[in-house]
Amino acid sequence: MKIAILSRNKKLYSTRRLQEAALARGHEVDIIDTLHCYMDISSNKPSVRFKGEPLPQYDAIIPRIGASITFYGTAVVRQFEMMGSFSVNESVAISRSRDKLRSMQLLSRKGIGLPRTGFAHSPDNIKDLIANVGGAPVVIKLLEGTQGIGVVLADTNKAAESIVEAFMGIKANILVQEYIKEAGGADIRCFVVGGKVVAAMKRQGAPGEFRSNLHRGGSAALVKLTAVERATAVSAAGAMGLNVCGVDLLRSSHGPVVMEVNSSPGLEGIEAATSKDVANMIIEFIENKKSKPHSTKTRGNG
């Protein structure tokens, strides 16, 4: 097969591993900087151009779309879908997962475990917003934040009110969530490929840090999932329509709750913690899907 990896940096671990896995399985691979692509949007022959030339017809594309380029990145993915390429994750599914509010509403609709959450822009009763999720301590998040940026733990109701007021001052959309104290600053990253959890790791925040992101100094280790945790991760991926994703869970007193579904999960942490060849599993998934006609759900209609 001819495969394109949409990535802004060919030296990144995840990009390199996907390229190595695809080449090892006998495929042709191009790495294309998503932002340097430009599109010819015509009704008879849509195309994507790069470095002054139209890109060839790819059997499959692997989008590695960073949060900061979601709008343009998903437009490029959608253009490839219109050209008939199979996308590991469809443009519409990536867009769903990047919108924190929309993704939580979709998970809620499917009855998937979530922390108690409030959403606001300019609430007329901040005290009620905080009380409605159980009161302090609460976690307050900027809707557009990534990698733990824009996430604040408020230990008291007064502190929570002050933080909400500060975010209101910059006209930000915010999420207010119950703090799952029993998780102990740890979460579980479940790596889902093709409707199955293929690897899982427990990420522990640095001492004194409630955020467990590896970018913030957290550590990772192999973890054994319960059947309920495994089913929750698979259901969350399905609710987003994502074939490949990282589902972040917290172990709460009332069962696993989903914190985030990541459409472009990194491979370095999960492969190091589990010693599993996740990149190879992704390429194998593409091979299996390409053997079936019409394997892209929306075929670019999204």
Curated annotation (Swiss-Prot):
Annotated Gene Ontology cellular component terms = cytoplasm
Question: Any note on cofactor binding?
Answer: Binds 2 magnesium or manganese ions per subunit.
Q: Which key words tag this protein in UniProt?
A: ATP-binding, Ligase, Magnesium, Manganese, Metal-binding, Nucleotide-binding, Protein biosynthesis
Binding residue positions for Mn(2+) 2 = 260, 262
> Binding of Mg(2+) 1: at which residues?
248, 260
Q: Which cofactor does it need?
A: Mg(2+); Mn(2+)
Q: What is its EC number?
A: 6.3.2.-
Query: Would I find Protein biosynthesis among this entry's keywords?
Result: yes
Q: Which PROSITE patterns match?
A: ATP_GRASP
- Binding annotation for ATP: 141, 178-179, 187, 211-213
Q: Where is the ATP-grasp domain?
A: 104-287
Tell me which stretches of the chain form a coiled coil.
none
Binding residues for Mg(2+) 2: 260, 262
Main EC class of this protein? ligase
Q: Which domain of life is it from?
A: Bacteria
Report the protein name in the record: Probable alpha-L-glutamate ligase 1
GO molecular function list: ATP binding; metal ion binding; ribosomal S6-glutamic acid ligase activity
Family according to the record: Belongs to the RimK family.
